[in-house]
Amino acid sequence: MVDAPHSKCGTFGYVGSSPTAPTLMNTYTRFDISFKKGNGCWLWDEKGKKYLDAVAGIATCSLGHSNRILRKKLSAQLKKVQHISNLYKIEEQEELSKYLTKQSCAESVFFCNSGAEANESAIKLIKKYGNTVHKGKESFILAAESSFHGRTLATLSATGQPKYQKGFEPMVKGFKFFKYNDIASVKKLFEELKANNQKASGILVEPIQGEGGVIPGDKKFFKELREICNKYNSLLILDEVQSGVGRTGKMWGYENLEIEPDGFTLAKGLGGGHAIGALLVQKKANIFTPGDHASTFGGNPFACRAAITVLEEIKRRKILKNVLERGNQLNEGFTKISAKFPKIISGIRGLGLIQGLVINDSYTDAKTITLKAFDKGLLLVPAGGNVVRFVPPLIISRNEINILLKKLDLIFEEM
């Protein structure tokens, strides 16, 4: 999962950023700018300055800004019904669930409103599974170091970065952490649990770590994770809040790893800029019964229509092909730029249109580069590990990638 902008750990905590109205709680530090118009991959501020957006609302605006088809479909939906609650059947929700299950390994879907809510749902599901299957034994949820799963107390407890947890202790009990892409670390945890007559009810893990530094999952590691979960009767749930819905060039992040999880979570790009989250599960994990979980707004007709439209447009416009092509173009450009500026760039990571430049911290930092990009009319966002993150709309064109690379080259040239 990828984090929302915050000040405590510095995603947007820039020097010179401006506080907003005193009527807003002080949870963010923001740029002193307000965008008034958007179209495709571009935004315009109140002074008319144009920006190429490689943030996309933090990997959210899949179809770009002010998409014509999305506007048309949502306008029509508002003329029908936008919210009625889950006391009643919702046709749009059923349509979306069929679309999602047809295209994935899942058989059932629970809808909510965000990535944190989707991961909270996954945590509850894993806990119920453990209490059902491993009766009488203390069980734990395993998660990765450097992960990010959300800001609710349970998802924060599942996040393997103590800096986010500081000040909110005690964390929810029942989580243990392993090193990402290190199967020996996972096996050690399972052996320790077995020795203590304890169980792992499930593993919650990202197929590509976003906030942790744009770190792709290793195929061999995930295949062994799948085998271990099968052996110990533990669920394998993937957090695809950031990597799902085409971001990596595959429809789902797990497809890059050549495995099938027992479930996975979605949000961000699913609604194309509109709030929706989802937990998708296979038969083994389809254990919720009425009363186990709920969401007032989850799966409302408006949000579901947005998601249906996003999925339809991805298919109609062959957007996955564009993500792969533009991702390759971006990577090739990064390779040339890193060769030109080896003192600044120490690595390139990512898949499709979630990529990161690892910045040599002895030279500068990701925040500084992001600020300089802002001045050049390019919107970027940092990630952990001194990484500059690139998550543009999935519709970005060849010419727009070239513009991005030229701006980036100029930024490094001036440093």
UniProtKB/Swiss-Prot annotation:
Binding site for pyridoxal 5'-phosphate: G115, A116, F148, D239, E240, V241, Q242, T296
Catalytic activity: N(2)-acetyl-L-ornithine + 2-oxoglutarate = N-acetyl-L-glutamate 5-semialdehyde + L-glutamate
GO molecular function, one term: identical protein binding
Enzyme class, broadest EC rank: transferase
Modified residues (N6-(pyridoxal phosphate)lysine): K268
Cofactor: pyridoxal 5'-phosphate
Enzyme Commission number(s): 2.6.1.11
Gene3D superfamilies: Aspartate Aminotransferase, domain 1, Type I PLP-dependent aspartate aminotransferase-like (Major domain)
Location within or outside the cell: Cytoplasm
GO biological process assignments: L-arginine biosynthetic process
Keyword Transferase: yes
Record-linked InterPro entries: AcOrn/SuccOrn_fam, Aminotrans_3, Aminotrans_3_PPA_site, Class-III_PLP-dep_AT, PyrdxlP-dep_Trfase, PyrdxlP-dep_Trfase_major, PyrdxlP-dep_Trfase_small
Binding site for N(2)-acetyl-L-ornithine: R151, S295
Keyword terms, alphabetized: Amino-acid biosynthesis, Aminotransferase, Arginine biosynthesis, Cytoplasm, Pyridoxal phosphate, Transferase
Pathway assigned to this chain's UniProt record: Amino-acid biosynthesis; L-arginine biosynthesis; N(2)-acetyl-L-ornithine from L-glutamate: step 4/4
GO CC annotations on file: cytoplasm
Additional remark text: May also have succinyldiaminopimelate aminotransferase activity, thus carrying out the corresponding step in lysine biosynthesis.
Recorded family membership: Belongs to the class-III pyridoxal-phosphate-dependent aminotransferase family. ArgD subfamily.
Summary of subunit composition and partner proteins: Homodimer.
Name this protein carries in UniProt: Acetylornithine aminotransferase
Lineage summary: Bacteria, Bacillati, Cyanobacteriota, Cyanophyceae, Synechococcales
